[in-house]
A protein has these predicted regions:
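Cytosolic linker/terminal segments flanking nucleotidyl-cyclase catalytic modules
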Residues: 2-15, 36-43, 53-138
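Pre-recognition alpha-helix immediately N-terminal to the DNA-recognition helix
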Residues: 45-48
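Short low-complexity stretches enriched in small and charged residues
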Residues: 2-4, 22-25
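Short, Lys/Arg-enriched N-terminal segment that forms or immediately precedes the first helix
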Residues: 24-35
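A detector for short, charged/polar N-terminal pre-domain segments
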Residues: 16-20
Length: 138
């Protein structure tokens, strides 16, 4: 099965050929609905915007300027060198996602990440890893 164009995939612990858009949207909603996802309203809008833009095949359009004007309501003459709102909020969003996946999302089927250096999210299937302490000889 070929993967959908325009959707970046991150593979952990195995080969993933395709994650469905619907599965990713369900994971997005699961995160947004969770009381364990400690993000502000702005960070939630940011997260939802970048995921939906990526799923719509517009990952290449996700830039600091686009996020500043579409999510944070900055004017068309926005300058990220003098207004670091996007990078600051991206870092806070990354920390909120990390906390979510350490607590409520540790068993979620899909991990959504926003790697440092980009605002384009990646998606991967989480695979349970069996600990040696749970393996017994019979």
């Amino acid at each position: 099965m070929a993967r959908q164009e325009g959707i970046p995939f991150k593979v952990l612990y195995g080969q993933i050929e395709h994650l469905g858009t619907e599965q990713i949207q369900q994971q997005l909603q699961r995160i947004l609905d969770s009381p364990e996802f400690k993000a502000t309203k702005q960070q939630r809008r940011f997260f939802e915007f970048v995921v939906k833009e990526t799923l719509s095949g517009r990952a290449h359009e996700i830039k600091g300027y686009t996020i500043a004007t579409c999510v944070f309501g900055r004017s068309d003459n926005f300058d990220q060198n003098s207004d670091p709102i996007v990078s600051v909020q991206a870092n806070k969003l990354r920390r909120a996602l990390e906390r979510y996946y350490l607590v409520a999302g540790k068993d979620d089927p899909i991990l959504i990440d926003i790697p440092r250096g980009t605002y384009v999210p990646t998606f991967c299937e989480q695979v349970s890893v069996v600990s040696d302490t749970n393996v017994y000889d019979i």
